[in-house]
């Protein structure tokens, strides 16, 4: 069922996923950039990729007619059931699937989550791209580890507090305005909430096993309430309303940080994030590379579409011996006819400048 859409998803500089599915409202060349680097983050194959095409349109206005479930043959002994794009309008008749572990119902016409109580062995449930307005009737699925209800019409996070074995939760591109009702999900490792209407990071302090958090393309104004997430390795906050890098001091295991398309003016607040290998601060209002000389494990540094105009700032990156990819295009620096040559001289380990590989 392609449960791993994640971290690397298209939440790139667009986003998101990731990620793995994560997320893509930016320009096409930005997407290409992510793919070239092999770090299609944050936003997930689900994040943002179809968002602009679909927008907030109510799928009920579509012209597809639901299919009769009696015309669909189900294998009683199947462990993996994929009914992607079958025009299913109602969940029914699945009680015969006593052994099913993964059930994919993406891209159908489902309006209500129902009639799944008998699927006690279910580990993964995919309801991506339907017409669901409410999370309900899932309490009996206590073995569930992966739940995807992205690209639906949800306004609230609810009805999942009993799913205590859940490890991955994807609710991308809905109409959710608040993070809530997930405090019991102690085993959660990946949370994907890109492309919603969330205004604050809150109610996640009990998610101490969380490794990846995708919140790209929301309305968040401040990095906060992250102190308990000491196992977090990926944080994606592209396309929000941030003006300051802060609140990351406890994220000592953070390896990938995506902050593009915000209103940040200064690089700061990264003193304890020594393990960072990926830093994306593209499309902000930053004039200077500073406070990153201690990030010696950096492999990728994306700072295109900012206000950088001083070549000596690149000295801040010289300690990153493994730095292979830098994006500095569409900064004032790029006007220099020796732009690429000067980057190569300042950062000899770099193998890719913007979207082009270095030729030796």
Curated annotation (Swiss-Prot):
Residues 17-34 have a biased composition (Basic and acidic residues). It comes from the Eukaryota. Coiled coil: none annotated. Its main location: nucleus. It is found in: Nucleus. Belongs to the SDS22 family. This is Protein phosphatase 1 regulatory subunit 7. It comes from Bos taurus.
């Amino acid at each position: 069922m392609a449960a791993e859409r994640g971290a690397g998803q298209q939440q790139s500089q667009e986003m998101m996923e990731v990620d793995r599915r994560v997320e893509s409202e930016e320009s096409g060349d930005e997407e290409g950039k992510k793919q070239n680097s092999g770090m299609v983050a944050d936003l997930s194959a689900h994040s943002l990729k179809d968002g602009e095409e679909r927008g907030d349109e109510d799928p009920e206005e579509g012209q597809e007619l639901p299919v009769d479930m009696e015309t669909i043959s189900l294998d009683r002994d199947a462990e993996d059931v994929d009914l992607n794009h079958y025009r299913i309008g109602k969940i029914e008749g699945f009680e015969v699937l006593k052994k099913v572990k993964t059930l994919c119902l993406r891209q159908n016409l489902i309006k209500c989550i129902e009639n799944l109580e008998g699927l006690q062995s279910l580990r993964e449930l995919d309801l991506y791209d339907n017409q669901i307005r409410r999370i309900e009737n899932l309490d009996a699925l206590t073995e569930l580890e992966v739940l995807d209800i992205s690209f639906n019409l949800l306004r609230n996070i609810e009805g999942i507090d009993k799913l205590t074995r859940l490890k991955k939760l994807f609710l991308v591109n809905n109409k959710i305005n608040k993070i809530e009702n997930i405090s019991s999900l102690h085993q959660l490792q990946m949370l994907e909430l890109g492309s919603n209407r969330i205004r604050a990071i809150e109610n996640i302090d009990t998610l101490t096993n969380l490794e990846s958090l995708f919140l790209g393309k929301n309305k968040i104004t401040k990095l906060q309430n992250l102190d308990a997430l000491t196992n977090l390795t990926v944080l994606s906050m592209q396309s929000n309303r941030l003006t300051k890098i802060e609140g990351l001091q406890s994220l000592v295991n953070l390896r990938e940080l995506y902050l593009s398309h915000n209103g940040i003016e200064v690089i700061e607040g990264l003193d304890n994030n020594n393990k960072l290998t990926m830093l994306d601060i593209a499309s902000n209002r930053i004039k200077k590379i500073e406070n990153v000389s201690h990030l010696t494990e950096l492999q990728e540094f994306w700072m295109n579409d900012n206000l950088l105009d001083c070549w000596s700032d690149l000295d801040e990156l010289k300690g990153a011996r493994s730095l292979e990819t830098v994006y500095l295009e569409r900064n004032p620096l790029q006007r220099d006819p020796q732009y690429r040559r000067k980057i190569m001289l300042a950062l000899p380990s770099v193998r890719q400048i913007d979207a082009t590989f270095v030729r030796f």
